[in-house]
């Protein structure tokens, strides 16, 4: 944060676990993922939903509730929790309008700003002006030269006639680049896996010393009926080419899919792959990965390294669970690297 404190944000949903539960209207349910349609416990309609911000001023030892912003949706959230601090101290986060089933927003990805340290957030700023492109931004990163990149996915769609399950096999990994320090002027999507046999919007990057990007993708393969047949993780090097990047050949990784990839370039020079199953590092642009002798993280982790070298990784217990099945507690891993 601008004041050197730490902030973590997550989605919290509360309400009755048993008894009466409201269901979303059929015209809304028909657009949503199969789980929300078929399993009432995945429908969050009628529950109290909020993005909850916790703040720490002692390096993550203790946390206090700082602020929250509420929303209402049949979905279990609308933001992957990626927030970046701009040069002027403004916070910028990404969200999905397609997940805000009860709000007057376009069904596509957008950005929001906070100029008061996450106490309040501004109106949606849509990532793409193309009303027939549905975007899924998941990560915002600041590069060493000050530029910003957003990674996620996108797919063409009819905003008046679309269904989530039909979009998934068409959604390919892409990125948006901003040369403006205010984070307002974004490029068209740069697709990096559009010729691949897999789809998804979840991927992350780590900047290499020469400006190239090491990228790790969650890769989902669908059959002709839209059924998932395989999931794993792939990787590539995005070679810097002026103000953009060109994707190299895509190869397998030694990792299971494990949800959203998370990469962290460390002060020690290695890049960490942070995941629930394990933490692994590479010093050769991803050609080899070495597993660390330490526990994995919570699901869908976010990681950062403090000035003293401590690495904090925050995730949650459980998976993409129905409401009330699992206490999806937020957990934190504290890690220090030892160079030998």
Annotate each language-model stretch with its function.
Residues 1-340:
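Asp-box/BNR beta-propeller blade signature and adjacent active/binding-site loops
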